[in-house]
């Protein structure tokens, strides 16, 4: 089912091209998204209602979901699911509190009377997008809201597409999680128009049809959501331009082929453009994984979607000489999710530099991270893991340098600053120092 790519004779420079990504042309989607963003900017609520009818086939009574609907959704939660939600929230919050929070620095005295410090401050207001396409990704509520709360964001809004099945409200699981997390500002708006609503703000006849603009938008979405983020960055801050999900697994002969097959399928289930890549030095393992995949795919609910993903160009089994070359491949690929299923997996994982998240050993599948590991599942895709990080508390915080100099400290450095400014042909900069010299 998965094609075989043999790189055993390839050089390091060629490894980045071993497995191409799926075609995900955000620029092409911009042609459809720009008019949507412009319409929301110019016509506000009227445009949002038109796009709800066009794309979601339902028009909610109000843009903002009533608080009572959030409470009702939480009250109707199945007990097992409520416990699963609560445990996921607890673990994600603990990791945020103990591993991700940055604090302001003590002032650094670079000279007598010359102090510089760094103040860490949260973003003021954020809009968090939760998709509802192939599946209602309720887990994205946790992954976006919890780090924003732990960062100290004072105003949090959530948007998710209205569902005809639920009377124009977002999926009940999404509403229930918002209630459990204490988020009361929830909008039944989806797609690119939701990103535009957050970026520009809209004002209706009352609060139920109004949304103040935000400072930053985060959360996953389809290609049109990504295009809207690209279109509106600068008007509003964004977390990333995330593409289709991807999993890479570095494995040797000690790995269980059934585990490998199940994990590859788990991410292929998301999208026909999802990437599933096994990197191994074991022909025996590769053949066993192929045998396991066929019946698993046929028996699962989303078999056609998974089969399309696994047989497309973005998915493959990559054969390498040894685990050392396998590490070169996965570091060049920079997967969103990377599993290490080898002997001495922790030591191998320590040699990985480029990955959105690393899952170590046979008992840490990507599905665990998708829901309840305590880690984030909003991760860089398409190779961006070589320079970008997943969504965390730090994503919602800003570092502000505070410069505090006395008069003597400035005058001690005046000659240097004036010389620097004049060397750059910026006499106005120099003059701002000169006018402060004693007359």
UniProtKB/Swiss-Prot annotation:
Q: Which cofactor does it need?
A: Zn(2+)
One Pfam annotation, family name?
Answer: Histidinol_dh
Residues that hold Zn(2+) according to the record: 267, 270, 370, 429
Q: Tell me the active site.
A: 336 (proton acceptor), 337 (proton acceptor)
Q: Which Gene3D superfamilies match?
A: 1.20.5.1300, Nitrogenase molybdenum iron protein domain
Q: What class of enzyme is it?
A: oxidoreductase
- Give the record's keywords alphabetically: Amino-acid biosynthesis, Histidine biosynthesis, Metal-binding, NAD, Oxidoreductase, Zinc
**The reaction(s) this protein catalyses:** L-histidinol + 2 NAD(+) + H2O = L-histidine + 2 NADH + 3 H(+)
Any one GO MF term held by the record is: zinc ion binding
Check the record and name the HAMAP family matching this protein. Answer: HisD (MF_01024)
Protein name, entry field: Histidinol dehydrogenase
Q: Which organism is it from?
A: Cutibacterium acnes (strain DSM 16379 / KPA171202)
Lineage of the source organism?
A: Bacteria, Bacillati, Actinomycetota, Actinomycetes, Propionibacteriales
- Name the gene that codes for it: hisD
């Amino acid at each position: 089912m998965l094609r075989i790519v043999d790189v055993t004779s390839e050089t390091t420079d060629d490894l980045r091209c071993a497995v191409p990504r799926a075609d995900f042309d955000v620029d092409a989607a911009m042609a459809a998204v720009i008019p949507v963003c412009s319409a929301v900017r110019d016509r506000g609520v009227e445009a949002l209602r038109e796009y709800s009818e066009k794309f979601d086939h339902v028009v909610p009574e109000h843009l903002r979901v009533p608080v009572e609907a959030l409470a009702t959704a939480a009250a109707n939660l199945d007990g097992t699911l409520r416990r699963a939600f609560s445990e996921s929230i607890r673990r994600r919050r603990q990791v945020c509190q103990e591993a991700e929070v940055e604090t302001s620095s003590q002032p650094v005295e670079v000279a007598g009377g010359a102090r510089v410090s760094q103040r860490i401050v949260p973003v003021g207001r954020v809009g968090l997008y939760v998709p509802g396409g192939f599946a209602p990704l309720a887990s994205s509520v946790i992954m976006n809201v919890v780090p924003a709360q732990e960062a100290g964001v004072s105003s949090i809004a959530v948007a998710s597409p209205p569902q005809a099945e639920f009377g124009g409200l977002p999926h009940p699981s999404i509403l229930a999680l918002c209630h459990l997390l204490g988020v009361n500002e929830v909008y039944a708006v989806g797609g690119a128009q939701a990103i535009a609503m957050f970026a520009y703000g809209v004002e209706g006849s009352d609060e139920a049809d109004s949304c103040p603009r935000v400072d930053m938008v985060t959360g996953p979405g389809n290609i049109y959501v990504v295009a809207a983020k690209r279109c509106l960055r600068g008007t509003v801050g964004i977390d990333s331009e995330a593409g289709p999900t991807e999993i890479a697994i570095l494995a040797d002969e000690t790995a269980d082929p059934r585990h490998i097959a199940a994990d590859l399928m788990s991410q292929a289930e998301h999208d026909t453009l999802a990437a599933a890549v096994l990197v191994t030095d074991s022909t025996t393992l590769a053949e066993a994984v192929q045998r396991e995949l066929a019946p698993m795919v046929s028996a699962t609910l989303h078999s056609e979607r998974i089969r399309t993903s696994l047989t497309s160009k973005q998915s493959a089994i990559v054969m390498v000489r040894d685990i050392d070359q396998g590490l070169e491949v996965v570091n060049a690929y920079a997967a969103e999710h990377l599993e290490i299923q080898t002997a001495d997996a922790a030591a191998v994982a320590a040699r990985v530099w480029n990955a959105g998240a690393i899952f170590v050993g046979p008992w840490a599948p990507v599905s665990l991270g998708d829901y309840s590991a305590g880690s984030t599942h909003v991760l860089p895709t398409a190779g961006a893991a070589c320079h970008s990080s997943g969504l965390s508390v730090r994503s919602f915080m800003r570092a502000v340098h505070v410069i505090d100099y006395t008069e003597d400290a400035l005058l001690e450095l005046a000659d240097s600053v004036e010389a620097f400014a004049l060397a750059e042909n910026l006499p106005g900069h120099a003059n701002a120092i000169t006018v402060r010299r004693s007359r």
